[in-house]
Amino acid sequence: MTFGIIRSIFQNVVFLLTIVLFLVGIWSHLYRHESNYCEMTYMFENPTYPRISLPADVETRYPRYALHSYCEGVRCEAHRRNQFIGYPVLFIVGNADSYRQVRSLGSVAYRMGDKQKQLDYFSIDFNEELSALFGGVLDQQTEFVAHAIKTILSFYKTKKTIILVGNSIGGLLSRAVFLQPPDRFDPNTVRLIITQATPHQAAVIHADSYIMNFYSRVNQYWKDEWNNSLKHLTLLSLAGGDRDHLVRSDLTSLNGLTDESRSIDVLTSAVPYVWASTDHRCIVWCRQLVLATTRALLEIIQEKKQDSQTTMQILKQYFSPSVDLNLGINTTLTYKKDPTIITESSISIHGKEENDYVIPLKNSKFHRIIIHSTNAKIYLRNTDVTLDITNTLLPIPPTYSARKMIRFDIKQLDDSLKQYDSILIRLENKKSQTDIYQIENDEQIVELSAFDSQTLKFNQAGYVKLVFPTLSNLWQVYHIHLSSNSENTPLIHFHVPWSNEDQYNLISLRPTSSPTTNLPKPLARQMRLKLHRPALFTNGEYPSLELFLNSKSSYTLEISYSFLDFLSQLIRYYIYLLPTFLFTVLCVSYSLQVDEVTLRTYRTMLAWQIHIPVALLIAILYKIVIILFPSSTFVVNIHSNGYYFFCLPLILYFLSLSLWAMISFIIDYLIFDFIHTMLYPLLTYVSNELNQQQKFTRLIQWISLSLPLMVTLLFSGSNGHIGLFILALLHVVWRGTINQRLRRVLTTVLLFHGLLAVLNLTGFIMHIKSILIQGLYPLLMIMPDPSFLSAICCTTAFYLRFTLSQSQKQIVQVLKIIFLKYNRSILILLAVISQFFCSYSMHYLWILISFIFIHVAVIFFVPSHRD
């Protein structure tokens, strides 16, 4: 007895601890990130969005959607007359977004443009539909985009192409429009697509089959046609990084869809002069990013050659630059006096006195040279030639500065550069400054281990490069804490070789409270080592951390594992797997109740002698499937993309177990016990009275049962699921209050209904919004209804509880015997099947839940087993 109490207390403590960690993980995911260093974009005049008329048949077919132009001030009068003189850009909004979000790009373009180069921004109003969570609208939205492009181009006499800028799911629509038939859309009218926080690889949540099929069609088309019918296209994908809680940066990758010859995917933290993470909304109005985008677009439309190679060069310059020494300019220099030769490994030179400095390249003992300069000229030279390479330098933080850098790998110079024997640095004025780092011992290997910390000390080291060969998993997050006896602001650069997600020490930028001032100079600097995209391959390169320090000072670097950020990464990358594990746990719990009807749902969660083996079985089967079926969809999604680790199924299983334990305890012990106490006499009396009026009872019963079906037919499948949940709740209250033993099972079944209802909330919201625009019509008359079939099947399975209550058919009795005999095996098999077929397609859970409803009806409502 004492052991049982202790075990129960221990289990409850584990449940509570798991839920607390889950909530802490959510908090960490939402709030533990870098500050928002983006500046707000403001409009100088009142923004206006004139609505543009489309052909009558288009307006009739898509009454929920509209096309608008953006204008300010005097230009609005021309826009109202559909008179445009600039270059057309169509902004395609994302999930639940407003067409007014175009104002940031439109306003900045209006201010930066002139008569020779202007951008005319247009925006689509999708009625703020939940297109990322409800696939029934995606095809209609894509069709409307095609019609909008055709209408916009009809306003221009000479412009035959348009630029597409897609935010969130709008970026996917900008790619999907190329699948439209030729009479609706001409692929040659679009040559550049820019996407902001668009999940290209897969949907954030696989809510329904329409989303899955839409992604499959679009991505397969792009894989097949990228170098065929799409060979004129250039694509830029921007990801927000750590601050974007809605779209993970790995989903914005173009890996496998395009190649690097005509596409770029980059995190905003790596974009020059942005160097900041953006959240899902902020990426639209972040001033630094808007400026970079506008400058790039204005330069692109000025080019006479509108080919993909020219466009790509401009995009790389603004979003992912690299040093191209071939762009250097031959020049001739005169010298007032002999240059000073630099032999030190680390030195900082200032322009107090105009002077020239030379760094020898020939026979140098150093492996690498890195130069950070402000207002200085950099040259490569030999006895015959001097090459000005100042314009090839790359910008580095802080944002509002002329600070730039260049690095030379002396041992691997190109053949064309081996002719030069020195680097010349010319300080042009008193504000000129150059920091030079000549590195002999290039790298220091740091082996990171989980839940471990390391402390490194650097004395009189100007440059330090730390390489982390064991940093390869998404759940590995480490805190970097740099302290020093110097007040100089060090520059820290975190580089990930397989992804454009470089991060600079953003505290060297500006504080959010006062964007125009410099940060104070505390003695401690902090940042995180965190991956946003898993390592699919390394080619011998690993993540690295570069520290550019003051060689006259000493520094202490602490690297510590961050458990809070580990929890945050679990939420960010694995939360979408939770519905399937919730179903799995309920299956196991229900199997226990079939064997012992008196067990409450909460008590089944304490049967660890069953749950632990099932969780281990799932973890082992995961590993076996990964080994035996490496090309299966399940393995490609969870393992090949770098997301899987062995303990993942165990963590998700016990998280689901803890959540159901808490929910079932509240529902069963607190709510239903209270209802039983309050209503038992009344419901018993009403039940006895109704039993004497069988015809009247059957009529009420069938009217009640017909409501979910009618709701499905007259409204939508999502409405039907929610109606079915309400009916199941009433059934538990009615039958469960009278029959305590049956209530135990019906409570578990109610949780299955609740899971279905939650998965269908977005469809319910979509139909309510469509009613407000188009009237009280069934969803199937307005758009495809992904939940229609599942609602019909689940409702029919629910009805079996009542139709089988009078059944004496032999086949039903045989089926009941089979279900009882192989109960545990059938339900655990069902739980395992859900893991491999529904983890990434959770909309298929309704098929398995329908079987559960049939199972309940056969076992508990067929006469021979009635309570």
Task: Identify the role of each PLM range.
Residues 275-277, 284-315, 319:
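Hydrophobic, mid-to-C-terminal alpha-helical segments
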